[in-house]
Amino acid sequence: MQIKRSIEKIPGGMMLVPLFLGALCHTFSPGAGKYFGSFTNGMITGTVPILAVWFFCMGASIKLSATGTVLRKSGTLVVTKIAVAWVVAAIASRIIPEHGVEVGFFAGLSTLALVAAMDMTNGGLYASIMQQYGTKEEAGAFVLMSLESGPLMTMIILGTAGIASFEPHVFVGAVLPFLVGFALGNLDPELREFFSKAVQTLIPFFAFALGNTIDLTVIAQTGLLGILLGVAVIIVTGIPLIIADKLIGGGDGTAGIAASSSAGAAVATPVLIAEMVPAFKPMAPAATSLVATAVIVTSILVPILTSIWSRKVKARAAKIEILGTVK
């Protein structure tokens, strides 16, 4: 049976399929973890420890050395994405109620959901798209996108926008596994190779545990809103990313639109933030569902939109070249 190949046909499948299975487990048998106990309970409820190991391995996979082109491109995209998320957070905090919207079509929408959906790029999706439509340097720009993984950037955005306050040691605790992994991976290439293999392997495990925090009835209630959130992520982050790629990154905008997705890891952010700041706990389930839907939507639409953009840009460039030759 080609289970893995079938799952990978779904955009973000290795994240989303286990997430859905976990949500099924939580919806129809919410006490399964406590009933079985031991290792089974650990797999069902171990979101934070599994993610801690994943962040460590993610840090170990990043090479310190990179070309100037790669750093300029990736730095431009990462800073722009985070800046846009900060602006959205600052505006949303003045419009959306403190505990999120509780009634009506926008029920479940919160500043936490907006920031979590917008401040991370799906690095793997970006790299695969740019390998097809861009240069090797542009594809390699995902190197700094790993820095967005985890709750740190969301914490910084929420903190600096005045939405939440975090003690300094909480910031350190959030980034320490990543930094230790980063240090070890760059001190010893063999350790980098060893730990980086676990990055993809751990995704289904933390996705399943994360799914066990989601009630499918919440997803049913926020489905259409989640789709609209995914579209909003592409529009709100995509336009500034295209402009930044052209003006600063030295590209034609293709990398910008390729970076306008939501990362699968962003699905875990609401739960992790709620663990640190209990005030966010009531919002976390709906925010998780919204972000999960946004991840699916952006995973489907971003490759299509990038393909259309790339074809138009290349056709325009070819036309200009022909006109120049004629003259």
UniProtKB/Swiss-Prot annotation:
Pfam families associated with the record: KdgT
One of the GO biological process terms: gluconate transmembrane transport
Regulation: Uptake is completely abolished by carbonyl cyanide p-trifluoromethoxyphenylhydrazone (FCCP) or nigericin.
Subcellular location, record wording: Cell inner membrane
Annotated source species: Escherichia coli (strain K12)
Molecular function via GO: 2-keto-3-deoxygluconate:proton symporter activity
Name of the featured protein: 2-keto-3-deoxygluconate permease
Disulphide bond pairs: none
HAMAP family: KdgT
Membrane topology: Multi-pass membrane protein
InterPro entries: 2keto-3dGluconate_permease, 2keto-3dGluconate_permease_sub
